[in-house]
């Protein structure tokens, strides 16, 4: 479904593994790319591989939202340097949203603790990201945060074009808690 009902189902189903009475997936929009995931073009294989590619996936004029997991963020760290090589001239904006739910497949994550998340945010800032925390249980917060991320990056690209900033630009990074 569309609207609030649809976004609520997406958020509730993200880690759903229930099987319906007929044997089908009760939550077809789970945490992994599958035939029910419209627009899902990469899962990454091992945790974090999608993070290494999302920054250059959108072409100029396109936009991409990359939903990432805190478990993946603890695995592959090459994407930490995306602000160093993202360029508005050859790529559309990419907006990473990390779902900080403290889970990595069947384990807990370090980022599942307040100390771990605060440390990760400091790390992101040091790598050139601009972390934005928001309530990951509120669908409206996702919309507002994506809008804010887009506004911040557009403003920075404009400032770069006006000679106020230079590359690397701070890349907004949403953290859904």
Map each language-model feature to its residues.
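Cofactor-binding active-site loop characterized by glycine-rich and histidine/acidic residues
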Residues: 1-89
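Terminal amphipathic helices with adjacent charged low-complexity linkers/tails
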Residues: 171-177
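Residue-level marker for buried hydrophobic side chains located in beta-strands
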Residues: 64-67, 96, 174
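A short, conserved beta-to-alpha structural element at the edge of catalytic cores
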Residues: 29-34, 85-115
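Secondary-structure transition/capping motifs at alpha-helix termini
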Residues: 52-60, 84-94, 125-130, 152-168
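Acidic, glycine-rich active-site loops and adjacent beta-strand->loop/helix elements
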Residues: 68-75, 98-104, 137-140
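Conserved thiamine diphosphate
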Residues: 19, 55-64, 104, 108-156
């Amino acid at each position: 479904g569309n609207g609030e009902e649809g976004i609520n189902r997406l958020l509730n189903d993200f880690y759903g593994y229930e099987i319906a009475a007929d044997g089908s997936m009760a939550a077809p929009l789970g945490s992994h790319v599958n035939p029910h995931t419209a627009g899902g073009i990469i899962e990454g294989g091992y945790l974090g591989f999608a993070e290494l590619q999302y920054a250059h996936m959108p072409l100029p004029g396109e936009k991409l939202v990359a939903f990432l997991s805190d478990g993946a963020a603890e695995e592959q760290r090459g994407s930490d340097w995306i602000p160093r090589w993202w360029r508005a001239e050859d790529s559309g904006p990419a907006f990473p949203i990390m779902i900080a739910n403290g889970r990595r497949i069947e384990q807990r994550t370090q980022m599942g603790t307040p100390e771990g998340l605060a440390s990760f945010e400091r790390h992101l800032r040091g790598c050139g990201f601009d972390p934005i925390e928001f309530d990951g249980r509120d669908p409206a917060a996702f919309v507002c945060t994506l809008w804010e991320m887009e506004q911040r990056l557009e403003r920075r690209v404009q400032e770069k074009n006006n000679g106020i900033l230079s590359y690397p630009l701070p890349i907004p990074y949403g953290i859904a808690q």
